[in-house]
A protein has these predicted regions:
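Beta-strand elements of well-folded, non-transmembrane domains
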Residues: 130-132, 144-146, 157-161, 282-286, ...
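Hydrophobic core residues within well-ordered beta-strands of beta-rich domains
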Residues: 138, 151-153, 293
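Bacterial N-terminal signal peptides
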Residues: 5-16
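Short, hydrophobic/aromatic-enriched beta-strand segments in well-ordered soluble domains
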Residues: 42, 128, 291-303
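Solvent-exposed N-terminal domain segments of exported/luminal and surface proteins
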Residues: 43-44, 49-106
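Short, Gly/Pro- and small/polar-rich lid/capping loops
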Residues: 19-36
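Extended, loop-rich substrate-binding clefts of extracytoplasmic carbohydrate-active enzymes
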Residues: 23-25, 95-149, 166-167, 178-180, ...
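A contiguous, surface-exposed recognition patch within enzymatic or periplasmic domains that forms
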Residues: 36, 43-45, 50-57, 64-66, ...
Length: 310
């Protein structure tokens, strides 16, 4: 009932216009005033500037593929007072490799207000605060195609410090309890098994399978797990019911990637927070002061039969 109350005003607007053009509206999204809703009449995406992330992606009027922490709807946090990770859900950027910063993520990048500009062609330009901890800031340009469901993210990391920084752009997307996730199995790279298994993160019995050139991972209710992959095919996907979300990026041969060469990563979270993370990572770059690097990723949503795998 809450979702209908939130969206009733915008659904009427959709019926009054032709499909095939992207519009951007300011809405109240579960208590966050002034959220940005992009739609082309088929798909829609919502960016919440107060917490710096995409919080909704799906078909117009349909289910949200992204996981949201309903206990935190409408809430914000003060980065100066934040000592632990506040897990709002949705999609955001971190720097990688994680082993260089441990835990929690810098609240300047994860949970702080981001500046948003609507560009003339209905793209969103999103700018994070400066991360003093990492010496960087992120700038994202988010483009929804004029028709269909494809979203393109131009994710740029800028060195705002006075010395070299060496990082990868890491896009972390939390998916609402999918039935299964998958990525290509690739045995000709750095992982003879076809995937990389993170230390102390092996899947529960029966949760990981390999068939037809793919690695499939399901969520366990009691145990977290994480795998990575270095397939040059460069895609990763999740399916829930008859909805399939595929995320992709171009693999760059010969470049250094985090986590034993992983460009693709899947993390499964146990109950009570029922989500899986699909993660795309760019090459590790050494940036001089003022230099920047960009990593382009794409999302595509489609309807499939429950027996279809791709």
């Amino acid at each position: 009932m809450l979702r209908m109350a939130v969206w009733a005003g915008t659904l009427l607007l959709i019926g009054d216009r032709m499909l095939g053009a992207v519009t951007v509206q300011r809405i109240n999204y579960y208590g966050w005033e002034g959220a940005y809703r992009m739609t082309n009449g088929t798909a829609e995406l919502v960016f919440v500037p107060q917490i710096g992330r995409v919080m909704r992606y799906g078909y117009v009027g349909g289910a949200n593929l992204l996981w949201e922490n309903a206990a935190l709807w409408g809430r914000t946090s003060d980065p100066a007072q934040t000592t632990d990770w506040i897990n709002y859900g949705g999609d955001k950027l971190w720097p990688a490799p994680q082993e260089r910063w441990g835990w929690p993520p810098d609240p300047a990048l994860d949970g702080s207000p981001h500046a948003v500009t609507v560009l003339p062609d209905s793209r969103l330009r999103v700018e994070s605060p400066v991360s003093e901890k990492h010496g960087i800031r992120f700038v994202r340009e988010i483009t929804l195609a004029a028709s269909g469901t494809e979203v393109t993210f131009l994710n740029t990391m800028i060195n705002v410090s006075d010395h070299e920084q060496r990082w990868s752009v890491w896009q972390v997307t939390q998916i609402d309890d999918p039935d299964v996730t998958e990525m290509p199995s690739y045995t000709r790279g750095r992982n003879p098994k076809g995937y990389y298994l993170f230390k102390d993160a092996d899947p529960a019995a029966g949760m990981l399978t390999q068939e037809k050139g793919r690695v499939r991972l399901r969520r366990s209710a009691v145990k977290a797990s994480k795998i990575g992959g270095d397939s040059p095919q460069g895609w990763i996907a999740a399916r829930r019911g008859t909805l399939r979300l595929t995320m992709s990026a171009a693999y760059e041969p010969g470049q250094e990637y985090p986590d034993n060469g992983s460009m693709l990563e899947i993390y499964t979270n146990p109950d009570p927070l029922r989500y899986i993370e699909l993660e795309l990572l760019g090459p590790i770059r050494t940036l001089r002061p003022g230099a920047q690097t960009s990593f382009t990723t794409r999302w595509r949503l489609e309807r499939v039969s429950q027996t279809e795998t791709r």
